[in-house]
Regions:
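The feature captures two recurrent sequence modes
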Residues: 1-105
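Generic detector of well-ordered alpha-helical segments enriched in charged/polar residues
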Residues: 65-79, 116-120, 124, 181-184, ...
Length: 233
């Protein structure tokens, strides 16, 4: 993922609880000129395909860590615009709201920066845990790796959804909307390739995903016969 460049900065369990969407708002990121913005012409279908000699768990863990770092960097670029005053709740397109659940299952409505701090700490804790994401050669991966990865990716999706919903104009002003599109496309093609997220978890950005993947080479023409379609009926 060397195509991404950015700078950034930046509490533990979560079950997201999106609220029903409200009437449609203007979505600048769906405009043709915005959809065409990207920083790479890479074929993400081929890029995410599991190489024959690579272990699936290793592929999953490596990408999860990389996606976390890149989403964290991207959010860091616009974090000064994401404040408790500007973003009193963690929302996505359609004003879908994400609620945080603590260890006891109690849900909380947080400001967006609080929510991002919580999920950043949670994901960082998971990927830094040798029992969850082992880094030593020969150390086996736990059976729970895929489930942990799914949860982490769901949380990372919330950050991307919030950026498109609440900070897309900031991204345009800073000239990073092409980076955001490329990161989101890579992230989603990987998730769908390995069935890491459910449709209901990502439907708030399905229109954007379909528009973005139209810019990619036809996956049916790839050499990799097992590559999946991203656009779903």
């Amino acid at each position: 993922m060397d195509w991404f460049m950015g700078k950034g900065r930046r509490k533990d369990n979560s079950k997201d609880s999106p609220t029903p969407p409200v009437p449609e708002e203007a979505r600048q990121y769906l405009e043709d000129s915005c959809v065409r913005e990207r920083v790479t012409d890479a074929d993400f279908y081929k890029l995410v395909a599991l190489p024959p000699s690579v272990d699936y768990n290793e592929w999953l863990a490596t990408h999860s860590i990389s996606f976390f770092n890149h989403v964290n960097l991207m959010y860091g670029v616009i974090s000064e615009y994401c404040t408790s005053e500007s973003c009193p709740s963690m929302t996505g397109p359609g004003n879908v709201q994400f609620l945080w659940y603590d260890d006891k299952g109690k849900k909380y409505k947080n400001t967006a920066p609080q929510y991002v701090d919580y999920l950043t700490t949670y994901v960082q804790k998971q990927i830094s845990d040798e029992s969850s994401y082992p880094t030593k050669f020969g150390q086996p991966f736990p059976n729970s790796l895929e489930a942990t990865t799914k949860k982490c990716h769901r949380l990372l999706f919330h950050v991307l959804a919030h950026m498109y919903h609440a900070h897309y104009s900031d991204c345009v002003t800073l000239g990073i909307h092409g980076h955001l599109n490329s990161l989101f496309t890579h992230f989603m093609v990987f998730n769908i390739k390995f069935d890491l997220m459910e449709d209901k978890e990502t439907e708030i950005l399905q229109d954007l995903l379909e528009a973005l993947v139209k810019q990619l080479p036809d996956p049916n023409q790839n050499d990799d016969k097992e590559t999946s379609e991203v656009t779903r009926s």
